[in-house]
Design a protein with these regions (language model features):
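N-terminal presequence-like segments and the immediate start of the first folded domain
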Residues: 1-58, 62-75, 81-128
Length: 128
């Protein structure tokens, strides 16, 4: 079965091309590229970790929807935070998106792109 690229490449801040697919389906698995708190205009959501976590999770939900998936289909999540002091605030907001139980997850500290406080990628399982 061929790999299906879902969505179109986006433009980031300053009109910079972002050369990756938002999602890729490989068989029954859907891989969502790392999402940050990027608004439609390519700018990062202003504000702290609360606003950026919500925007990032909403972006994940939107890309999942383009692939015919929901958060219920997510099997694994990888999270990068630029400041570990934000963990508990992030965690509370993150948990609200998974009221029926959260998927497997890893969370690490990482230097992220300018102004981004969080990045999230996911792997979903959704049989064709």
């Amino acid at each position: 079965m061929p790999i299906e690229r879902i969505g179109v490449e986006r433009t980031g801040a300053g009109g910079q091309n972002l050369p990756f697919s938002p999602a890729v389906r490989a068989g029954d698995f859907v891989f969502i590229s790392g999402q940050v708190a990027m608004k439609e205009n390519g700018e990062i959501e202003p504000g702290g970790i609360e606003a950026q976590t919500r925007r990032t999770m909403d972006n994940v939900v939107a890309v999942l929807a383009k692939a015919g998936c929901t958060l219920e289909d997510v099997a694994k999540v990888n999270v990068w935070l630029d400041d570990t002091r934000d963990f508990w605030i992030f965690n509370k907001i993150y948990a609200s998106y998974f009221p029926n139980g959260a998927p497997a997850r890893s969370t690490v500290k990482s230097q992220l792109m300018v102004d981004a406080k969080i990045e999230i990628d996911v792997v979903a399982y959704k049989p064709l």
